Amino acid sequence: MGMPLPWALSLLLVLLPQTWGSETRPPLMYHLTAVSNPSTGLPSFWATGWLGPQQYLTYNSLRQEADPCGAWMWENQVSWYWEKETTDLKSKEQLFLEALKTLEKILNGTYTLQGLLGCELASDNSSVPTAVFALNGEEFMKFNPRIGNWTGEWPETEIVANLWMKQPDAARKESEFLLNSCPERLLGHLERGRRNLEWKEPPSMRLKARPGNSGSSVLTCAAFSFYPPELKFRFLRNGLASGSGNCSTGPNGDGSFHAWSLLEVKRGDEHHYQCQVEHEGLAQPLTVDLDSSARSSVPVVGIVLGLLLVVVAIAGGVLLWGRMRSGLPAPWLSLSGDDSGDLLPGGNLPPEAEPQGANAFPATS
């Protein structure tokens, strides 16, 4: 199937049945980030696509291909769709990296340039566009798709806006995307993949113990590859509830999530404990004993490292997901390229999952 003609969107907007109420239709948003001088092995540009709080797309300058995430990997999309996403994001990558080079040349320093671009659907299925940009964590520019210009009050705004206005058709393409392509894509996702928004993937689990301080042990209950992200931990001692521990949750980069909870117990008492989780994907709570797993046979360190490697491909996913889930207006990051390694969740990994060497754990491809 070829690319749709310009008039096809107008016809689709008129004829599409109003099966989704405006209060249930999620926005489609692209979050773009470019950094100066990225840390070794990290991309200089990456993008994530979101349908409401659910990530459906990832792209980075190392792989240079747009890939679907989670349940959207099985969406019955038209043949050209992901090629078009890739082409558009490569164009955005070029614009963002050229802007960074120009800012560095004129003003010196290192920068993080970000954008939040997308749309919601009005009651008549027309686009309610969003196009805002941030520099080093502060919003500094907006794009008006109906006028076709970038505006803001910062000196840096003028530099970036003038650069982009000189690019052939850059403003026209941005307007076309926000007013036409974005609502068309959103409507297509809702028609072809509406069940994906109700996707449920149950977790795999593992319970491990390690020595703590002053005669204690620390239990780590880990849950892997689940969706939606809401999950409830519970530790059991001799079958009775013994608290939920200290919990953390983050995205894997493929649309699913991982989580863990830590509980300090008396050393020698570890085998009296079990870990239990409740999740929408489970018909009943899932319980696991110490040093055993449910629906998983891979060592916890290998799984967590695999998750870390996936997150590297979409650096910043943890922070971005947290902001998107919180409903904050824009998930801006203030880190420069030299600090981009801090976008990764390594500091939040449970101690037994910390890498001990390059060859310590199984690699993932």
Swiss-Prot record:
The protein in question is named IgG receptor FcRn large subunit p51
**Annotated segments matching region Connecting peptide:** 291-297
Residue positions with a glycan: 108, 125, 149, 246
Read off the lineage from the record: Eukaryota, Metazoa, Chordata, Craniata, Vertebrata
Q: What CDD domains does this protein's entry cite?
A: IgC1_MHC-like_FcRn (cd21011)
Write out the ranges of the annotated region (Alpha-3).
201-290
Signal peptide segment: 1-21
Locate the region Alpha-2. Answer: 111-200
Annotated effect of mutating residue 111 to F: In strain: P/J
The record's region (Disordered) falls at: 343-365
Under the subunit heading, UniProt states: FcRn complex consists of two subunits: p51, and p14 which is equivalent to beta-2-microglobulin. It forms an MHC class I-like heterodimer. Interacts with albumin/ALB; this interaction regulates ALB homeostasis.
Which subcellular locations apply to this protein? Cell membrane; Endosome membrane
Which of the residues are on side Cytoplasmic?
A: 322-365
Classification via InterPro entries: Ig-like_dom (IPR007110), Ig-like_dom_sf (IPR036179), Ig-like_fold (IPR013783), Ig/MHC_CS (IPR003006), Ig_C1-set (IPR003597), MHC_class-I_related (IPR050208), MHC_I-like_Ag-recog (IPR011161), MHC_I-like_Ag-recog_sf (IPR037055)
Residues on the Extracellular side? 22-297
